[in-house]
Structures are given as C-alpha cells and as structure tokens.
Amino acid sequence: MNQDEHKIVVRRMAGLIAAASVLIAVYVLRLIFLQLVNSDSFKSQATNTTDYNFTVTAARGDIVDSAGRRIAASTTSYNVVLSKLLMGDEDLDAMLQRIVELLEAHGEKWNDSLLIGEPDAAGHYSFTAQADSTSDQKALAAMKDSLGLQQYATADDVMEKLVEDYKLESYPLHWQRVLGGIHYEMQQQAFSNVNNFVMAENVSEVTVATIKENSLTMPGVEIVETSTRSYDEGDIIPHVLGRVGKITAEKWKVTDENGQTTYPLREKGYNMNDMIGVSGLEAVYEDELRGKDGVETITRSSDGVIVGTAMTTVPEPGHTVQLTIDSAFQQAVDKALAKNIEMINSTYNSGSSAKAAAGAVVVISTKDGSVLAASNYPSYDQNLFATQYSQYSSDPGLPLLNRALQGLYTPGSTFKPAVAVAALDSGIINRFSTVYCNGVYTYYDDYRPKCTRHGHSGNIDVVTAIKWSCNIFFYDVGRRLTSDVYDAYAYKLGLGQRTGVEVSEAVGRLTTKSDSNYTASLDVQAAIGQGNTVVSPIQLATYAATLANNGTRYRTHFVKAILDTNTGEVLSETKPEVMDVIEGTGNTFELVRQGMKQVPSTISGKISSYPVPIACKTGTPQRSETYAPGKHYLNAMMVAYLPADDPQIAIGISIEYGGYGARTGDLVVDIANAYFALKDGSLAQQAEAEKEAEQAQQEDQAQTTDPAQAAAGQTTGNAAAQPAQMTPAADTAAPETAAEGEAQPAVQDEQQPAADTEQNPDAIAPEN
C-alpha cells in the first residue's frame, strides 16, 4: 500500500469512527431523555388504566308505627348480576344459556319483560299483552318503538328483528325466544361497560352458592347483595302503605305531545333497574325513603386486567317514616271489623242485610287529626301481593279496594248532626224549637215521605230528633235551610271534600241544586243523608272529630314524623293543622253533643251500657237493589266520638249490606276497649300473646294440613260469609284494576228521592 492509499484508508476510518461516535452520542442522549427527562410519561403509558364507576344501591328507609315497630323494611336479598366489564371476550350468548340452565335447575326466574310467549307448533309467536290492560298495551307500544318497528308489527316481526339484531339464527326457536328476551331486557337496562345487568332477583341461597362455586368459569357473573321490601305484618294497612316496584319503560322514557323525549328519573339519579315507590305512602314519601346511592370504582389496565376496586362513595340509607298508627291497635280494629261483619252474617242473614260481606272503619285522634287505624274488610297481604295478585283482583269481595279512603257511601242519618249544626248556627232553630212528628211529612201535596217513629211522636226538639233520628224534624229543617246552607256547613265539617291525608282519597259529593235530577223534594231527602250525597269512611271520621272539637277541623294525616335512620333524630314532624273552623253561636255543638250522647240508649247491645259516655249517630241508607218488591238492601253507617265530654278519638264506619246502623254499636265498643287498652299499655302485650298463640296453631295445622289446601285462599278476611252473593256493582262499582294493582274509588249510584226506610223486624232498635 503506497502512501496515498494509506491516507485514503485513514480518512475513511476516521469518517466511520466519527459517524459511529455521532450515532453513539445520539443514542446515549436519547437514553438520557427517556430515562431522566420523560420517564414519568412513559411510565404512565406502560401502566395506563381506566376507572369504571358502578352504582351501589342504598337501603330504602323503613316505615314504622307510632311506637317504632317496623311495618315495612328492607331485608337483605341477592341478585344475579352480569358485568360486561368483567366478562371480557367471553361468548355472551353461551354464557347466558349456561346461566339460564342453572337458574332453571334451581327453580329461579330471570328478568324478561318481552311481551311474547313461546312459539307454537308451527313456529309462530303471539303477544302476551292483555288487550284490556292499559299498562300492557303501553309497554307493547314502547317495545315496538324501542326496536324501531311500526305499531302494526306482529309478534313474529318482533322476534325476527331480535334474532337478526343479536345474531341468534343458529339457535332453536325456544332459545331464540329466551335469548331474545334477555337481550331485550339488557337493552332496557342499558347494559354496558359502565352499567351492569340485573338478570335475576332475590335468588335462593342455594343458587348463590352454586354461582359462587362456578365463579372461575363464569367471569362477569356476580352475586350482588341488595335489599328487598318486606312487611313484618303484611296485612297492616296495605292499601295505605302502597308498594314498591320496578321502573316501567313509560316512566323511564317520557315523550311529550311535541315529541320531545326526556328521562326525568335518570335526571334524579335513578337507574333503569331501580325499585321505586309506585303507590300509597311508598310513592308519596319516595324522596324520603330513597337513600343516597354509593359508588364503587373498578380500575382496569390497558390489557384488560382488573387492578383495583374501591368504594369511593359510601351509600346512605333512606330516612325512616313514622306513622300515627299503632300496629297493635290497627290489628285490634281489623279484628273488630271482621267480627262485626261475621256477627251480622250469622245473626241477620236475610232481608236487608243478607249480603253483608264488606266494610271499613277509620279511627282518628280528635286532638290533631292523626289516623289511629284505617281498616278494610276484606283486605290482602302485602307479602302475597305479587304471587296472589290474580286471585286478589278477581275476588268478588274486592280486597284491593281501599274502602276506608276511596269507598263512597250514602251517609244516611249520620248526616243529620251536620244539618242540626247548620240550623242552630244560622238561627233557623234554637234549643226550644220543635217540629211536630206524626210519622208523615205533609208539607208537599204530591210527596209525603215518612218517619218510622222508633220511640217518639208529637213535638220534637233538636236533641230528641238526633236521639231518635226523627226524619220529619230534619225534613222540615232541611227544607227551610235549603241544601245551599246545610251543604256549606257539611263541607266545613269535613264531608264531600278531601280530608288532607297524604295518599289518594275519594272526594265524594253533596247533593246540590246544580244536580241534573234536582227537585225541591231532593232538598229534604238530602237533609237525612240520602239523595246524591256520597262520602267516605275517612270523611265520616273527620266529620265526627270536627263535631267533637266544636267545629274545629284538623287536617287528617297518617305520618307522624320523618326520622334519621342511623340516629333516630326527628328530621321533621307533622304539626296539627287547622283546615276550617265553625265558630258556633251559643250552644250549637253542645246541643248536638247532647243528642248524640243519648243515641246509645236507643241501641241494643254493649254500647247502651258502656261505662264511658259515647256520642254517636247511626245511619241506615238505602241501596238501589231490592231483595223483595219495594224492599231495599241497606248499608250500616256510624259516626262516633268518645269520651263524649272529653273526646279523644272519633270513628267512621261503613258496612255494606249491614242492614241497620245500630248493628255497628258493638263494633264501636270493641274499638273503644282496644283504645283504652292501648292507653294503659296492655294492648301490645295482648297482641303479642295472640300472635304467639296463632303461630303455634299454624304450626300444628301445618303438620296435619294438605299443602295444596293450605295454599288456597289467601285473601285476608272471611271471603266472607257469602262471597257468591257479593254484587258490589249495584251501588258500589267494581273498580277497574289499575296498572299497579291499586283499586280505584267505588262510587254509589245516584239515587232518586226514595221513600224512607221502613221498620224491619230483624233490626236492633232500628232507625233511619
């Protein structure tokens, strides 16, 4: 190699070394940059995670009685829940098949609101929505709409759409229906990475154990502890308590008349699969009973591995709603009502009371309008509502009807004290005013209603007229007052208008001159509680309390207070609220009290000799049906308060087909006895002893009774003495069953002026 060639090699080597040095320098600098300057950024990328938040449902608040005993509570239950986040790449339909088979093996059901039945032999489907059910038809329309189908779409069209959307073509028809229904339910619950799907609810412990045992091979299938509404005594005021239920599609998605869609419940923090109060106090106090949901956060890495879970927000239970009702007293009144109806059936089982099988009682405190008891007969058991709904809704005795608040009845002679108050206060009569009674009212030439003259005749004053329920006296006073005047007083006393209770109640009505069938004679009929006037038992009790309070009417109410569930602290309390006042001139209310105090002496039975003075007024209004030509069935009505001179409680009673109002006298005494036992503390002990004895008897019967027989007949109450003879449609219309299973008000027929009730030989000191 010559010198020139050597120089060339050296230069090339130097170039290579320089180039290599530059590359090494760049590499070193890059390493320094990665390790020191931007290490945090790359470390974050290497450990990239995503947080997913899931709702943890808060426990619903309890409903307790005035003594703090639980009536409605949340008990622990278990749901089968699917987490899309945790399922990963699992075959969803294969997993669903496996879960369904497991649930079926344990006798469980899963959530499926698709209104389509199993395919027939030809492979065609049919809708299961009831044609006469408004809720079913709304749900059916919503289902078609959510699937993008026209309203004329058939069940086959719906299934074809589901099979296509969820690629179920390879499955047999049965499994297409099962999986299609579950997918539809998932769609309704918005199943996603951030929203789990509740597949089955309140499953058994055996099912819980089986799923947990298979957890490794069933990723994303979880058992979630939740709460279920339960009732310690399911037959205590079920109509008033109401119930909870699932959020319906119509309530979740609301479309107004302009086509605008909103999600009001979602905006309030609800999830589609939440339970919500749908009727009664459960619905009215939803905001108080519903707790504040918690949040559980699940952290997942970029490669799908769950790296952490944390309860980021602890759920807070709902508040406790405390009622004015004492459960022991309520049960005592329930039993007393059933006993009274059974007595009428066994003793007076023909004529005007041949079909006595239903009734209601309301007892309220005269001091503040708080409801102490609200009884319906027949009734039902809250704990059996879901499983026995079909039986309850078809029962001719209408156990779902809240007669105490929504039953409307002609008041009969219980209305007479209102007319007396109006006449005395307006100056039409005074203590010494009299009306001559000879048994026939002769003011009109072409209309001469009668009086049965049970124990009076001649010149009758207001006290005697109330005592003996003299129709002639009230015909004449009512005619002179006119319905405009005595109606105004009746309204202020609490009749024909809302009492103010927190839950749904019927308004009723009074007879007015604007009525289409109004005549002058209707004024005199309405003055004795006939005509078009209809009121509810809770209005009768409120009215009796207002008479007892000398014209001061309080708002009637069921809720005593709202309590903090954890501490018991009173958060809010219902204060006595005066709704109306009749000042009452002179001795108006005292004269009415004197007349009502003498009524018990005209009634056979325990009430006539009861040691505590009772002020009462019976009523025997006619029903439209007759049991013989010219002979009408009769209801038995009663208003009472006691002790008469220092009132503590007021009572309103209605017994359908009860025959005569006087037949409720023993019922008033039984209620009074229970009340005084409540006051001295013995009632709770007695109730507990009776409960233990009843449980022991049931255990004995369970050992000897055929299970099939034991499963039959769940209606609370004697269904009844003669269920086949119950025909409420004649005067008390059978309710159209609401979507939520809550009966609507029963309203009596409007009646033309009728001849006065004739004396019946089977009556206990009969009166009108």
Regions found by a protein language model. Name each.
Residues 1-314, 350, 354-360, 700, ...:
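Membrane-proximal periplasmic segments of bacterial cell-envelope enzymes
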Residues 72, 78, 299-316, 325, ...:
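Beta-lactam-recognizing serine transpeptidase/beta-lactamase-like catalytic domain environment
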Residues 93-101, 209, 213, 238-242, ...:
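Solvent-exposed, polar/charged alpha-helical surfaces in well-ordered, non-transmembrane soluble domains
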Residues 286, 290-293, 303-304, 334-342, ...:
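Amphipathic, well-packed alpha-helical segments that form the structural scaffold of globular domains
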Residues 336-348, 427, 600:
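Structural motif corresponding to the C-terminal cap of alpha-helices
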Residues 678-719:
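Intrinsically disordered, low-complexity mixed-charge segments
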Residues 718-768:
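Long, low-complexity, intrinsically disordered segments
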